[in-house]
Each structure stands twice: as C-alpha cells, then as structure tokens.
C-alpha cells in the first residue's frame, strides 16, 4: 500500500525511516512542507500517487481539506499523553514549573498526561490561547499570543503544535517545546 506522509520536511526522514522499518509492506510516499499554508499546493493533483494520506495532526489535515476534496482516505496521527509526558520531563529538567501556555486545544489530553504523571491541579497551570483564523498572519499571531503569556509570568514555557511557531519563539528566546507524535502514536495510526 502506498502511504502518503504529509509532515514538515524536518521530520520527514525520521518518520519515513520509522514507518519503513516497522511496516515494510508500506510504500512511503513523502509530501514534505515547510509552512502549513503550503500543504494544499503540495498535495494538489497528487492524491493518485498514494492510497491514503497520513497527516502530522488534525490542523494540517483541516487546512488541506479547505482547498482539496479528499479522493483517498486521509488520516491524522493523534496527539497523546505520552508525547506530552516527554515534554513535561524536558521542561522540569530545564527548571521550569508546569505553568504551560499552549496552542493545542485538547485539554483532555493534557489532563490525561497530568494524571499519568501523578500531578495534581495545584501543581500545574494550563493556559490555552484563543483559536485563531488561518490567515497569512496566523503563525505570527499564534507566537505572539504564546509569548505574551510567558513574558507576563502567567506561564513558564510554551507547548506548540506548529513548527513555524516553535522556530519563531526560539529566535525570540522564549522557552518553547514542540509537541511531536511519539513512535507509539505513529505505530498505532499506521497499523
């Protein structure tokens, strides 16, 4: 089966290598992008190259579906508590309190991760930025909203689901972590 992988170019080699190793029967067809706004252009007219598409997350899939009608199955790798636990450990090792600003609007995933880590509500604080419209200024607006929460002291660090936001905040020296799917998340989705 030909599996079209639609993810940021920076993750492509690692993700494709993992899938090819774990699922040798799958023929991986890469569809890398740099910016979420490029996804429709990257996919336009190319659905016939794959039997299904696998997106890094729901946001990327949603963005593509605004301009392209799926003619093959489109799946997304779900975000999981295990991916968040990895980031909590990294943040704690760096000395950050678990006061988090995020653009991932899935509170149940955060709550599940907090419970799995044995953390109480008194030990954590979660601040969701408002959902923003997908415009040409989306990435900048998202980064600024997260940055504002850290600079105000409301949050100690950020967790983002967008690669461009991650890089923008790193350039601004704002503590930020990129929420990526774990190998287990990928495995569960492909199998």
Residue locations for each model-derived region?
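Alpha-helical/coil-rich non-catalytic "connector" segments in signaling and regulatory proteins
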Residues: 1-191
């Amino acid at each position: 089966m030909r599996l079209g992988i639609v993810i940021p170019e920076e993750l492509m080699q690692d993700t494709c290598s993992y899938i090819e190793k774990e699922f040798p029967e799958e023929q991986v067809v890469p569809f890398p992008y740099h910016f979420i706004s490029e996804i429709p252009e990257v996919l336009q007219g190319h659905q016939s190259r794959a039997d299904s598409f696998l997106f890094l997350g729901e946001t990327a899939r949603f963005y593509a579906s605004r301009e392209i009608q799926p003619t093959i199955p489109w799946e997304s790798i779900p975000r999981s508590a295990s991916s968040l636990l990895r980031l909590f450990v990294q943040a704690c090792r760096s000395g950050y309190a678990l006061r988090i600003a995020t653009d991932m609007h899935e509170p149940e995933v955060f709550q599940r991760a907090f419970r799995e880590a044995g953390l109480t509500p008194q030990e954590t604080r979660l601040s969701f930025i408002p959902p923003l419209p997908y415009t040409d200024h989306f990435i900048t607006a998202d980064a600024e909203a997260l940055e504002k929460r850290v600079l105000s002291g409301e949050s100690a660090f950020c967790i983002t689901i967008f690669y461009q936001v991650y890089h923008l905040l790193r350039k601004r020296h704002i503590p930020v972590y990129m929420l990526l799917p774990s190998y287990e998340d990928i495995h569960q989705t492909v199998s």
